[in-house]
Swiss-Prot record:
The gene is pyrG. This is CTP synthase. Mg(2+) binds at D71, E141. It comes from Streptococcus pyogenes serotype M18 (strain MGAS8232). It catalyses: UTP + L-glutamine + ATP + H2O = CTP + L-glutamate + ADP + phosphate + 2 H(+); L-glutamine + H2O = L-glutamate + NH4(+); UTP + NH4(+) + ATP = CTP + ADP + phosphate + 2 H(+). Residues 1-267 are annotated as: Amidoligase domain. ATP binds at S14, I15, G16, K17, G18, I19, D71, R240, D241, V242. Allosterically activated by GTP, when glutamine is the substrate; GTP has no effect on the reaction when ammonia is the substrate. The allosteric effector GTP functions by stabilizing the protein conformation that binds the tetrahedral intermediate(s) formed during glutamine hydrolysis. Inhibited by the product CTP, via allosteric rather than competitive inhibition.
Length: 534
């Protein structure tokens, strides 16, 4: 029988529910249990694919092409699993499906209501996420906080699950903030008490509290919370601020969180062996070297827009016993005149993806600076496309060369819309999304990065591609197409072989990087940057 764990939040949002859920997932996986995890987002968008990065941070893409919340990146990195489209559910997605069924007459003339139709659809998503992965345990995080009007159908569905599958198969974990008032010199439990009261008013009694705090929590505070919130005192778990996120699973294990969960759900599983994870954390805390990487992006005011990129750089740094000193460079600020001033102290330059015209000329100048000064450079998605545009302009002398996306009237459309995208009108969910194979060119830097594999599978999110009409001219000038689709039609990786490291990929390698298993192309880039700093 599948076990269901529901993680809710109270007092404030962005409290770290996703990290707690991911950390618990890691502990349970290391007990030998098969774990999956999902995120409920109460917003009305179908998915975050068309949302501004300033509003939502990065869009995380799964193997099967779902555009999802960035928390799924935390889930995959912590638990080291590949999630699917059932791992992110939004209000918009649920209502869209229910309304589509109503139009088809599948409700046989019934009045369609929040209860039972919306709640049934939500419960079906929970069960489907578990069944498609054949999991022993599914962890479901509900975005936002208890009391948000948008969350009510989600919480009602969670309440009903207890009756549907039995109380012994369901556990509710509530995460809250425990504020410390310096003036009073004490922690205040009242916000948590009121949050739990609100949750209980909706029919959910939490079995465990996870309290986010900056300071150590005395046992007396835990006992008080246990008494007023009707949970066992040992089930009041402290989640204190840490230097590195990857410390959190170890901190939770030290408080027997996973054992309490297993006892409640009657899961007979051995103790979690966290030896490898602990060794990784110890290494992360004691890195001996540092290298500076300039990230040239258009959303640098919000680092969450590049969360997976940053994590992938860190992972590759760990593999090299090196801390990444990240320099955020706003692409709008980069010009041919000041590129050296902005980028001259960087050991490596990364140009990540993005959409729209703003900042693209600055990215092109950053790529030009890297090429002309032989600074290790990694381009991702739009960064790859602009790498091709930069080469066309400044090496092939194609004045005004551009991407058709950015300048439809350009004489040299180096990047063009994919053929199967031409007649698509909707923006959401219509990109080339998910896992696709990439055939590597033997002897190339890309092939060497991937240990001379013939084919790698990586995740994509794009609508435009390199225009093959220009391929022969590029190759004649020494531009190497080192990765292509198996049918040789779509360019996946480009590089300049004579440079220290000048490689750009159409796909998003960062989405498959893990702290104990860094992505190979990122590692090759970081290794080149480290060598460049010596």
């Amino acid at each position: 029988m599948t076990k269901y764990i529901f993680v809710t939040g109270g007092v404030v949002s962005s409290i770290g529910k996703g990290i707690v859920a991911a950390s618990l997932g890691r502990l349970l996986k290391n007990r030998g249990l098969k774990v999956t995890i999902q995120k409920f987002d109460p917003y009305i968008n179908i998915d975050p694919g068309t949302m501004s990065p300033y509003q939502h941070g990065e869009v995380y893409v799964t193997d099967d092409g779902a555009e999802t919340d960035l928390d799924l990146g935390h889930y995959e990195r912590f638990i080291d699993i590949n999630l699917n489209k059932y791992s992110n559910v939004t209000t918009g997605k649920i209502y869209s499906e229910v309304l589509r069924k109503e139009r088809k007459g599948e409700y046989l003339g019934a009045t369609v209501q929040v209860i039972p139709h919306i709640t049934d659809a939500l419960k079906e998503k929970i069960k489907r996420a578990a069944s498609t992965t054949d999991s022993d345990v599914i962890i479901t995080e509900v975005g936002g906080t208890v009391g948000d009007i948008e969350s009510l159908p989600f919480l009602e569905a969670l309440r009903q699950m207890k009756a549907d599958v039995g109380s012994e198969n369901v556990m509710y974990i509530h995460t809250t903030l425990l504020p410390y008032l310096k003036a009073a010199g004490e922690m205040k439990t009242k916000p948590t008490q009121h949050s739990v009261k609100e949750l209980r008013g909706l029919g959910i009694q939490p079995n465990m509290l996870v309290i986010r705090t900056e300071e150590p929590v005395e046992q007396g505070i835990k006992n008080k919370l246990a008494q007023f919130c009707d949970v066992n005192s040992e089930a009041v778990i402290e989640s204190r601020d840490v230097e590195h996120l990857y410390q959190i699973p170890l901190n939770l294990q030290a408080q027997s969180m996973d054992q309490i969960v297993c006892d409640h759900l009657k899961l007979n599983a051995p103790q979690a062996d966290m030896t490898e994870w602990s060794a990784m954390v110890d290494k992360v805390m004691n890195l001996r070297k540092t290298t500076k990487i300039a990230l040239v992006g258009k959303y640098v005011e919000l680092p969450d827009a590049y969360l997976s990129v940053v994590e992938a750089l860190k992972h590759s740094g760990y593999a090299n016993d090196t801390a990444i000193d990240l320099k955020w460079v706003n692409a709008n600020d980069v010009t041919v005149e000041n590129a050296a001033d902005l980028l001259g102290d960087a050991d490596g330059i990364i140009v990540p993806g993005g959409f729209g015209q703003r900042g693209t000329e600055g990215k092109i100048q950053a790529i030009r600076y890297a090429r002309e000064n032989d600074v290790p450079m990694l381009g991702i998605c739009l960064g790859m496309q602009l790498t091709c545009v930069e080469f066309a302009r400044h090496v092939l002398n194609m004045e005004g060369a551009n991407s058709f996306e950015l300048e439809p009237s350009t004489k040299y459309p180096i990047i063009d819309i994919m053929r199967d995208q031409i007649d698509i009108e909707d923006m959401g969910g219509t990109l080339r999304l998910g896992l696709y194979p990439c055939k590597l060119k033997p002897g190339s830097k890309a092939a060497m990065a991937y240990n001379n594999q013939e084919v790698v599978q990586r995740r994509h999110r794009h609508r435009y591609e390199f225009n093959n009409k220009f391929r022969s001219e590029f190759e004649a000038a020494g531009f190497v197409f080192s990765g292509v689709s198996p049918d040789n039609r779509l360019v996946e990786i480009v590089e300049l072989k004579e440079k220290k490291f000048f490689v750009a990929a159409q796909y998003h390698p960062e989405l498959q990087s893990r702290p104990n298993r860094p992505e190979e192309l990122y590692t090759a880039f970081v290794t080149a940057a480290i060598k460049n700093s010596n």
